[in-house]
């Protein structure tokens, strides 16, 4: 979906430290859930208790990421599953900026399908129908947050980013409250560890060849098209 490329661009800025796929938000969200579940029905006056819980959770995440924010004034957390926790993120860090990386749904799902993730919570990536179903759920969730938090969530389309990089990069930086720096256009020169399948992509200047890469496999993707409610002829909505 372009998350690695987007993070590499932002991490090329002098004020941003790239954090990669962090698990901290998921961990503190689960801890909050367990805490609140253990109390059953919250008693009167629970607003103060919840506020204290949120402060403690925010402090815990801040402590988990201290190795990042001590280096630069901002850092990125590009865990893809963070879209499930945008509400929690906003409660813990109301000033956080969320960049929603979006790409053609067929291209996104095929990219997931072609990667051997191993065991875990993304076994749906081995089935085209399930992939499409999960993607549709993700779309509905993001439609909600784009409406509810328009000033905190920015949608960036991969196709637009590779077509007009300078315009889109400026838009991202402005959203994040950062001044433009030429290094963000020269992101492929940044030497930092990248532990994702998109490593090769960000070691080169922006290129467009991957935009329609999915069309090479189009005849095999009928279950995915059906699950997404798209036309196989062009990947668009019927």
Segment roles from a protein language model:
Residues 1-93, 97:
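Phosphate-binding active sites in nucleotide-utilizing proteins
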Residues 8, 20, 75-79, 97-102, ...:
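Short beta-strand segments
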Residues 44-73, 109-155, 162-238:
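PAPS-dependent sulfotransferases, especially Golgi type II membrane carbohydrate sulfotransferases
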Residues 89-112:
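Conserved phosphate-donor/acceptor-positioning beta-strand/loop module used by diverse small-molecule
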Residues 80-83, 103, 139, 159, ...:
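Alpha-helix N-cap/helix-start capping motif
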Residues 23-25, 105-108, 161-163:
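Conserved nucleotide-binding/hydrolysis micro-motifs of P-loop NTPases
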């Amino acid at each position: 979906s372009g998350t690695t490329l987007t993070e590499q661009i932002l991490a090329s800025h002098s004020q941003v430290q790239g954090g990669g796929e962090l698990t901290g938000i998921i961990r503190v969200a689960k801890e909050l859930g367990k805490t609140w579940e253990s109390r059953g029905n919250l008693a009167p006056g629970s607003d103060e208790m919840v506020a204290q819980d949120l402060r403690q959770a925010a402090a815990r995440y801040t402590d988990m990421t201290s190795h990042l924010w001590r280096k630069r004034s901002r850092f990125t957390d590009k865990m893809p599953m963070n879209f499930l926790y945008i509400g929690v993120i906003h409660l813990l860090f109301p000033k956080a900026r969320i960049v929603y990386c979006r790409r053609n749904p067929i291209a996104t799902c095929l990219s997931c399908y072609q990667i051997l993730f191993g065991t875990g919570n993304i076994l749906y990536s081995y089935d085209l129908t399930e992939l499409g179903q999960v993607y549709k759920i993700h779309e509905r969730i993001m439609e909600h947050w784009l409406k509810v938090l328009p000033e905190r969530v920015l949608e960036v389309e991969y196709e637009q980013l590779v077509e007009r990089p300078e315009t889109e990069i400026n838009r991202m930086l402005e959203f994040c409250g950062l001044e433009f720096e030429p290094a963000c256009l020269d992101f492929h020169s940044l030497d930092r560890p990248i532990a994702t399948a998109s490593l090769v992509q960000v070691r080169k200047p922006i290129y467009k060849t991957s935009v329609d890469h999915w069309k090479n496999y189009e005849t095999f993707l009928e279950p995915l098209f059906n699950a997404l409610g798209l036309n196989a002829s062009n990947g668009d909505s019927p």
